[in-house]
Amino acid sequence: MMSTYVTFKHFAWAGNLVRSVFMSRNVGRYQSSKTENSQDGNPLLKYLTMKIKATGPITVAEYMREVLNTNPLKGYYMHHDMLGEHGDFVTSPEISQIFGELIGIWCVSEWISGGKSKSLNLVELGPGRGSLMSDILRVFNQFRYLLNTCDISIHLVEVSPKLSEIQALNLTENSTEAKYEDKSPCYKMGITKTGLPINWYYNIQDVPSGYTFYIAHEFFDALPIHKVQKIQDEWREILIDVDQEIPQKIKICSWF
C-alpha cells in the first residue's frame, strides 16, 4: 500500500492534489507530501469524508469533479471569479486581445475555405470571463460584409453560475434565464453586443449539431483524470480515501 496525505485549502483546488501526487517524497514503502493543518468546519471536506465513508474510496477523477466543478458548497469554479489581476491566475486572453483576434481570423479563413456554409455554430468550452469570445466576435463584426450570408450562433458550455454571469455581462447587453417550461437544452440565452444569438449549456451534448467550430482554451488541463500507477509489474488506480488515523485529512492510496 502506498499513501499520500492531502489537506484542503480554502477552495480545495486540484493544484494541491497534483502537487501532493507528483512532488511527493519516497519514504520506504510510503510516499508523503508536505501538508498544512486542515481547516476546521470545511463543508467540502466534511461532505467528501461522509461520502467516502458511505460508498468507499473515490477516484481522482471524482475528487477533481467535486473540488473543481460540480460541488455547490465549495467547488473552485462555482462561486468566485478566479481570473484576472485580482484572481488566482491569468490566461492569455486577459492579457492581450491579439490571441483571440487571430483565432477569429482563422475561423473566418476556415469558413471561407470550407465553402462558406450558410450556418455556423461557434462553440467554446469553459469560456472563462468571455474575453476570448469577445475578441473573436470583434473580428467577426469587422468581417460582417463577408459573413452576412452566414447564420452564426454562439454556444458556451459552462457549469459555473458565477462565470456564466460574468460572461453574460461581458458579451451581451442583456441575457435571460431559460424557463423550465420552455424545455430548452440551454439554461441562459441572449444576444451578443454584435447582434448574434448566444446560449449557455451545462453539457456539450446539448449543443445543436451543424457546421461547427469548437474552441477550448486552457480547458482540457482542468478536466478530471483517472490516475494509475505501476507497482511491482501491476497497474493500480489511485483512489482517495479517508485517513483513519487523522480524521481531518484524506489520503491518496493505490488500489489493486
Description of each model-found segment:
Residues 1-39:
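N-terminal mitochondrial targeting presequence
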Residues 4-10, 37, 47-50, 56, ...:
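Class I S-adenosyl-L-methionine
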Residues 29-35, 65-71, 133-134:
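Short, functional N-terminal and low-complexity linear motifs
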Residues 36, 55, 87, 91, ...:
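Conserved aromatic-histidine-acidic binding/catalytic patches
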Residues 39, 43, 47-118:
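Conserved Class I S-adenosyl-L-methionine-dependent methyltransferase catalytic core
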Residues 96-192, 201-202:
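SAM cofactor-binding core of SAM-dependent methyltransferases
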